[in-house]
Amino acid sequence: VLATTSFLEDIAQNIAPSSCTIQTIVPRGMDPHIYEPTPSDVELVNQSDLILMNGLRLEVWIDNLIDHSGKHGKKVVVSKGVNPIENESYENAPDPHAWMDLQLGKIYAQNTKQALVELIPEQKEEIEARYQEYIQEMDSLHQWALTSILEIPEENRVLITSHDAFQYFGKAYGLELHSVLGLSTDADVQTGDVLKISQLLQSRSIPAIFVESTINPKLLQQIAHDHNVSIGGQLYADALSNKEGPAPSYLSLFRHNISTIKRGLSAESSTSTSSAPDGVKWLSYGLIFAIMASLFITSYRKLS
């Protein structure tokens, strides 16, 4: 069984019987939005009996990879049944990050279970038992997440991150969401988005903002520095950490993120609602724009 991402691989490993081999295309720590398949990935596809993918335009490279492999085995979109959040800025661009709500993650698990039962029906009983145990863990973790977020002061329940991967998360657990980048990490940084974040931090006492594991943290670090706001920690969304890291599994990703967010947003804010002197403010914007230009040039060179 071949999963496109590390979190889908982990979900499958928790449900599949021990006799089933689960592998992933996008390695741990790597961004599936901008992943570039390798020749070894073609071989993985050729060896697979089943491919589990997120869908919702997360893996825009998958069809081309399958075409290159020449093998057209069974492909299952595990987000099937999710009512996606639509992107207001672009048509036909649903938010793919539905796994960031554990209740929707149960749909992923159910679709994975069904695909495994169809692949190896003789092991249906074991698959069903493992699935039920996993669902119970997800339900328990979901309730803990709800309780934990409620312990954050209400005025602090504002989550500012690198890219827009936490809309399902915020909707499920009661957080107001803002980000510098859009739904995909290959989007360009927009000046207006940076200014909105800066204005938000000037007008409200938000104690922390958060970087993400698969995205260059420089821009958010500069914004935090300019507004005397803490970096609350590193969150995981599009990929799991390595096995020795803080988010080696889908469920531990949630435990880590909730704990990190609660700790960061429960702290006393060191920001002041008064504006910085104009000279300092414009110097800050200049530094931010310089970082944006550097990131754009790096991306352009990579594409070239």
Task: Mark where each language-model region is.
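Extracytoplasmic metal-acquisition and chelation regions
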Residues: 1-304
